[in-house]
């Protein structure tokens, strides 16, 4: 094994690319230069040029998998800091997230159906707006294709992270709570990360949106599909 295939080297390359991409977006302010999108694109080119397989590259990923769970738990910190506001606005928060879940599932399912997608594809697209682990479990329970769901979830997150705040600016939605909840619910972890870059307040509401939408989607997607006659 040459040094290019060393798991620590590949991990360092990943961190380095992401750090530079983060700096680039911060300097330019261009949302299209999303650090996650840039990192993925550059890594694909790097792996192709060096003829390193994905399996070899992914060995380095096992070194940091442990930190995924603590990172999710850490999302509770900004939530706690906004606890009083959340308590006061609990009903509109819950209703908006419920509505967002229902509209999100129905819209993608109907569009896919109108375009002639098979039931298997529809089941794979239905949980598009929640984090990958939840989305894949929902897809498995429905009989969809988990790997397709994972790819769709990443694409949805990137689009939400790039276009989310721009879209809300055009519609004159200025409330940090509304923006954070919307982005967390629609663009899950990527949207939450983008919100955290703005402020802890935005990040707190995005974390809440991500969590509530994940719960509602897991619970309601099978029922929605049955009501639409697709399950």
Question: What is the meaning of each model-derived region?
Answer:
Residues 77-90, 113-114, 137-155, 170, ...:
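Helix-loop-helix hairpins and the membrane-proximal interhelical loops
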Residues 1-14, 59-73, 119-127, 147-155, ...:
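Structural signature of hydrophobic alpha-helical transmembrane segments
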Residues 121-148, 154-155, 167-170, 174-212:
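Alpha-helical membrane segments and immediately flanking helix-loop junctions
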